[in-house]
Amino acid sequence: MKVTDVRLRKIQTDGRMKALVSITLDEAFVIHDLRVIEGNSGLFVAMPSKRTPDGEFRDIAHPINSDMRQEIQDAVMKVYDETDEVIPDKNATSDNEESDEA
C-alpha cells in the first residue's frame, strides 16, 4: 500500500496543531483529519482520533506496522516542508489535539 496523494493545509492556531491533512492510499482510499502536531521532540503526524468519555484520544484509523506509519510520516512531512502558505483558521481549535506522542 502506497501513499499516492497528500492534501495539506497549514493552519495558524494557539495550540500545537500545525496542519490538517488528508491522504490517499493506492489512489483508492482517502483518510481525512490527520494532523501535524508540534510535540516535545518535533513535528509528528497524528492519526484521526476522537476523544473518549474519559478524556483519552482513540485513533479512528491507523497503520498497523511501522513501515506504513513511516511512509505516511515521510509523505506528509515532505508536503508540509514544501508548503509555505499558512492559513489563519478560526475553526481549528486545540480541542482535538492529542498529547505529545513523539
Swiss-Prot record:
Keywords: Cell cycle, Cell division, Septation. Gene3D superfamilies: Stage V sporulation protein G. The keyword Cell cycle applies. GO terms for biological process: division septum assembly; sporulation resulting in formation of a cellular spore. Pfam families: SpoVG (PF04026). Residues 83-102 are annotated as: Disordered. InterPro entries: SpoVG, SpoVG_sf. Belongs to the SpoVG family. Could be involved in septation. HAMAP family: SpoVG. This is Putative septation protein SpoVG. It comes from Staphylococcus epidermidis (strain ATCC 12228 / FDA PCI 1200). The gene is spoVG.
